[in-house]
Amino acid sequence: MANKFRYPTGARPLLIEETARRRQTESRFVALLEEAGFAEVVLPIIDFAEPYAGLPGRVEKQSYRFTDREGELVSLRSDFTPMVARALAPSLNGNLPLRVFYRGDVIRCEASRLGANREVFQIGAEIVGDASAEADVAILRLAASMAEVLSENPLIVTSGAPVVDDPRFVEHDEEGDPGYYTGLRFWVYGDDRRTPLAQGGRYDSLYARFGADAPAIGFTFTVN
């Protein structure tokens, strides 16, 4: 009988109250993003695996991959950022800079620094085609504003960031594999200062993988 109510490790339902809280947070995030001039894009939760093969970082290792009925190797969405680059790259056509946001579930084979759940809801934003320090600061300040929806006293830990005169920001040299990030990286913490609420950075080489010469910077919040 107990087995009828088990879920895979890292997956669980959200019932009425939790769903209502998530929707409220999502609505407030979307309002901030739209106010800052970001437009929404919607991405599939399933895609071919080949375009993401060999990406730096943990995208392949975190992705569920399987062969579909047509014999194609496909994967479930485990990271929005490469999917955004693949979707936007063919249609940029010099129409830059571009501000976009996205939201939806990601499904991973393993837990990440953003928490132990393998299925999580995320919402994030990118500025594409702007390599300036002003774009860096705009993204950092937007992330800080969104963090205040979840935390009374957020902290943004940055590595390689321009100087931001704001007590919410602290600089820290991060070690370890940067994955597809190429410069600035940052992590957003809530009041408990433990698991990051969000992470982001600059990935100026990612779009080139999909045929577009476009720098980009962005972040993703995980909303549990």
Predicted regions and their residues:
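TRNA-binding/sensing appendages of the translation machinery
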Residues: 1-77, 82, 137
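Hydrophobic transmembrane signal anchors and adjacent membrane-proximal interface regions, especially
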Residues: 75, 156-158
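Positively charged, Gly/Ser-enriched RNA/tRNA-binding surfaces
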Residues: 18-36, 47-50, 81-94, 100-153, ...
